[in-house]
From Swiss-Prot:
GO molecular function, one term: glutaminyl-tRNA synthase (glutamine-hydrolyzing) activity
Gene name for this UniProt entry: gatB
Known function: Allows the formation of correctly charged Asn-tRNA(Asn) or Gln-tRNA(Gln) through the transamidation of misacylated Asp-tRNA(Asn) or Glu-tRNA(Gln) in organisms which lack either or both of asparaginyl-tRNA or glutaminyl-tRNA synthetases. The reaction takes place in the presence of glutamine and ATP through an activated phospho-Asp-tRNA(Asn) or phospho-Glu-tRNA(Gln).
Protein source organism: Legionella pneumophila subsp. pneumophila (strain Philadelphia 1 / ATCC 33152 / DSM 7513)
Biological processes annotated in GO: glutaminyl-tRNAGln biosynthesis via transamidation; translation
Protein EC: 6.3.5.-
PANTHER family: GLUTAMYL-TRNA GLN AMIDOTRANSFERASE SUBUNIT B MITOCHONDRIAL AND PROKARYOTIC PET112-RELATED, GLUTAMYL-TRNA(GLN) AMIDOTRANSFERASE SUBUNIT B, MITOCHONDRIAL
Name of the featured protein: Aspartyl/glutamyl-tRNA(Asn/Gln) amidotransferase subunit B
Family in the record: Belongs to the GatB/GatE family. GatB subfamily.
Keywords assigned by UniProt, alphabetized: ATP-binding, Ligase, Nucleotide-binding, Protein biosynthesis
Subunit record text: Heterotrimer of A, B and C subunits.
Catalytic activity line of the entry: L-glutamyl-tRNA(Gln) + L-glutamine + ATP + H2O = L-glutaminyl-tRNA(Gln) + L-glutamate + ADP + phosphate + H(+); L-aspartyl-tRNA(Asn) + L-glutamine + ATP + H2O = L-asparaginyl-tRNA(Asn) + L-glutamate + ADP + phosphate + 2 H(+)
Amino acid sequence: MEWDTVIGLEVHAQLKTKSKLFSGASTAFGATPNSQTSFIDAGLPGVLPVLNEQAIIMAIQFGLAIHGTINDLSVFERKNYFYPDLPKGYQISQYQKPIVTNGYLNIQLGNNLEKTVHIARAHLEEDAGKSLHDAHTDYTGIDLNRAGTPLLEIVTTPCLYSAEEAINYLKTLHQLVRFLGICDGNMQEGSFRCDVNLSIKPKGSSVLGTRTELKNLNSFRFIEKAIAFEQARHQDILESGLSVIQETRLYNPDNNTTQAMRGKENENDYRYFPDPDLLPIHIDKEQVEEIKNNLPDLPEAISKELKNTPSLNDEDINFILSSPDTYQYYKKIKSLCPAADKTIINWLKGQYAAFLNEHNLTFETPPISAKTMAAFLSKIHEKKISSSIAKNIFSMLCTGEKDIDAIIEREGYQQQNDNSALEEIVEQIIKQYPEQVTEYKAGKEKLLAFFIGQAMKQTKGKANPEQINLLLKKHLG
């Protein structure tokens, strides 16, 4: 029997606010356990939450970026459940009146296909704390540093039908929140994590099957493997004549299986009701318009613009959009340098990216400023240095040198453009290699590169290769 897989995703993106959603405690990652915990985070009686305005602004930014509806009235509600790292006994979230509804995100699939993923809602809620199972041998510790950190929960409709579609959507969303500057996207630190709701149904059927939820996946590779395992598990159960149980499961990467965690709750189990300590949020159109006018450049628009640059291919564009810092670095160089787009991107994704990877650096803190890199590429564009000399200069720039003209003067890297001197070198090479000259004239034109190489060798890389090329063709006939 053939089956269709149906997937809906819930992504929790930690917002990059300096303080928590309802308290002034810091959101910085990696602090000593419980050192960034306020009375509100600890759930002590008599304390009242105060809403972080910046979190509201970030949620609106996201809603605009996904072409969603920004609701003028939004309400915080209490989601009631017990868990050791939730000291209040409830989570402040949004249910009936979220900030954002009815958005979409376009994703790219293979063979130049595009799919629109419908986003049902995006709402604000506070994160829970952490259970520390490895810190002590005889009991579990609780760290409330994360408790109260603002989350934007982004929920799709069940409109994804394969692991490939799910991963492409998640990567596109991950890219978007980073370019918006609302989330750092650090999956290892839990800043961007995903719950997968999955079911299967007979092929072509309009009736959805019983779903299971896979919780807190924080790696694209693990998400893909978890979906594949859960698809196969559902299929085995149904083809054995049994029924899938609606439950929450955890993925175990050590043995590539999912394990039951608890029965899957319905909304009624959480007994949502408006939080009496928080007033409804009224968002006026003028505020939304102001936020819209200040949105940064976003990946979809940048990609369309870059695709109008004939010299850039998909690989080049993907590199430029690999992070906001990479894009900003490329954009700054473009504004300062007359070099061709292809020249810029070849240096950035080639020798520069290799150096960054080798030294565990990124374009967030580049060893060469965009201004210096633009000046360097301008020298290449103006043919003041050859490509072989450029590599030597680049290595020096990576070690902290900044004055390119001083390097050229000190090392004697001035390019030789004297036509008569270069012509003399070409004549010497032709006399030195008569056998190769004969072969070239007989039709072995690839030998031209050999002659150019000899000229560059004799001039220690200082000759203008284009001039050498023209002179060789002139003398070889």
